[in-house]
Amino acid sequence: MILLNLMLYFCSMQTTSTEIKKKCIRSLSAEELKDFFVASGEKAFRSRQVYEWLWKRSARSFEQMTNLSKETRTLLENNFSINPVTISQKQVSTDGTIKFGFKLHDGYLVEGVLIPADDRMTACISSQVGCSLTCKFCATGYMDRKRNLEPYEIYDQVVLIKEAAEEHYQTPLTNIVLMGMGEPLLNYTNVLKGIDKVTSEEGLHIASKRITLSTAGIAKMITKLGDEKVKFRLALSLHAANDVKRNTIMPINETNNLNVLKESLLHFCKETGSSVTFEYIVFDGVNDTAQDAKELYAFAKNIPCKINIIEYNPIQEADFMNTSVDKLEQFKKVLTDKGIIVNIRRSRGKDIDAACGQLAIKEVK
């Protein structure tokens, strides 16, 4: 009876109507895929073959699954879609950075970036189509959020950027940062599932410590990351250690103020044993004074951390200005003199709008 019900369930996916979409096969667990094959009268081991094609071998069509019979491939084609992410646009910066426009199965576009460096090859990927937050310095913040990305769409971005790294630089991908379009912690479940596939042996088997999730600061979700003892790195997009200033730059601070954020970060560090990275864009006349640096030290001093000071990358929608090199160095010195680890991060891909804060694809659908 169970097998009959399963068969009826999966057969119900078949339709001649163009109005009903096929279920994406990559939304099934390994066990659900096995159940489908058994209910269809196929050998259970076929599910393992297909699962390997879908994840480890990143098949983009059922026709690529050459160790399956034509009948089995037709069965899959009639019941499922794969919904692969494809590259619709590509731009190469003078510094070697490559920006991608990724097209999703429903026509929406998101952006990702390959950032080459002497000691690493980094993929910057998106977690949402658009963003519901309204950070004033970020181009994505001026777009509406259309939808969350599915786990397989997060995974596919990594696969495509990994292939580009090998093609253009003959170098493997070493790092992944979720710093593209969207707020990852507002797509919590799908992002963690996507990371799980990227790190698993059945997927790309990339070490968790090579992955960094960047958030604007959703305190309760940072606490949840700590509770789940995640293995990947966490970065907080901070940009001011003063609630009044941060409210202006990042309105999310009005509901996730600095005290609440500090509490959640301390919990995260305690539960995971990891440090965090604070990202701090220095804007001329806004947050670049010695007093701002002292406030940043006061916020960070009891949290295991390092601080990345970032050059501002101009966008059309905002009138912020980059601070001077002298002010940048003075700001850094205030922190390093107090024992804080500080890096100044130079912009990459600015000439193709691929730098931090510049991702906002011109054509959304």
UniProtKB/Swiss-Prot annotation:
Stored PROSITE patterns: RADICAL_SAM (PS51918)
Paired cysteines (S-S): 124-356
Entry annotation: catalytic residues: 111 (proton acceptor), 356 (s-methylcysteine intermediate)
Chief location category: cytoplasm
Pfam families: Radical_SAM, RlmN_N
Compartments in which it is found: Cytoplasm
Occurrences of domain Radical SAM core (ranges): 117-351
Enzyme class: transferase
GO molecular function annotations of the record: 4 iron, 4 sulfur cluster binding; metal ion binding; rRNA (adenine(2503)-C2-)-methyltransferase activity; rRNA binding; tRNA (adenine(37)-C2)-methyltransferase activity; tRNA binding
Family: Belongs to the radical SAM superfamily. RlmN family.
NCBIfam families assigned: rRNA_mod_RlmN
Other observations noted: Reaction proceeds by a ping-pong mechanism involving intermediate methylation of a conserved cysteine residue.
Protein name in the entry: Probable dual-specificity RNA methyltransferase RlmN
UniProt lineage: Bacteria, Pseudomonadati, Bacteroidota, Cytophagia, Cytophagales
Gene this chain is encoded by: rlmN
